[in-house]
Amino acid sequence: MTFSRAAKRDTIVLGLFSAIGPFAIDTYLPALPSIAVDLNTSTAVTQMTLTMYFLAFGLCQIFYGPISDMIGRKPPLYIGLALFIFGSIGCALAPNIAWLIAFRFIQGAGTACTMAIPRAIIRDLHTGLEATRMMSSIMLVISVSPMLAPLTGSALIISFGWRSVFVALTVAAFVSLALLFFLLPETRPAEKRLPISLRGMALGFGQLVRDWRFLGLTLTGGLGMASLFVFLASSSFIYISHFGLTPTQFSFFFALNAVGFIGSAQFATTLAGRFGMARLVMGAVSFYAFFALILLALTAAGVDSFAVLVLLLFCVFSCLGLIIGPTMVLALEHHGPLAGLASAFGGMLQMATGGLMIALTSLFFTKTALPMTAAIALCAVSAFVLAFATLGHREPAPQAAE
């Protein structure tokens, strides 16, 4: 199975759009300790810049998705990117932590469009294994972000200070606007658009809320993402402040998790075609819980080894490469007419889960790995229970691509 030239172009462009949100997180992670010092605030308050970003990132997807079902996919992308540019400029000029938190919220509100709408576009174009293949390819592009972004951020921070990160994000958003205008086609033609109706949106929400399979799959993937968000919020303080790494060394070890995620995601389509996506997800979530519980047990027993932490986190995030993409494909496959709304609602649930876990972890943060590993284990066990409650039955033969 190979992509056409147009499909390859769309995959690359959608992947770049989808990477904007993670890139806006990962580039400034190495600067969190220095931001706390520069703006004279605490670690917990500094982590609020992540929490508010994730909150807006999740909640605002619920706006972009339904609107894209009604007026097309491209107009909401223009609106979101404009908001992101405004928020990035505000962050670059932030005189205090309150200002930075507020404009990070605006940033998140803008970049929410780049999460909800690309997944809806994939559903416009494909279902089944072809959708899994395209989603995995996009996840590959997204996953390069954790390898490049911290290194890029470290270089900018060392050379020009942490504010330069937000200047670079502003430039990247303008490039994305150009790609949107010149390269991305409209995949929601007028004849397929839903009427602009609050009642229709309410009925669509009702349909999704009553679909236990949709909710279970979305939250399974969301709990996987939540463990990633907890790592994002805690890792720079643990690696730099606790273990004494430099920002550049932190970026390297941070990128190892992306390597595991990328490597496993490349096998998602092959494994789904052989075993079925449900069996793939159940197997991956079982190993996810297994490695997370081992990590928690060792940390709780007082094992303060950087090598052990890095190795087991690599295993945990390798499992997520086989969970996050396939669960979203399975969740959306029966909701084609509501693809934008379903993608947005699913994204909102996932981001809200991640934001809540960050807030919960920050309450117990000690600059050691224990609160982080406990939160990751909680996410993993919960995902395991949800996955087996949702998918613990015989799956039909693997679906052919459309």
Where are these regions (language model features)?
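Helix-breaking motifs and short loop linkers at transmembrane-helix boundaries and internal kinks
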Residues: 38-40, 72, 93-99, 110, ...
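Cytoplasmic helix-loop-helix junction between adjacent transmembrane helices
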Residues: 103-144
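C-terminal membrane-cytosol helix-exit motif in multi-pass small-molecule transporters
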Residues: 171-190, 386-390
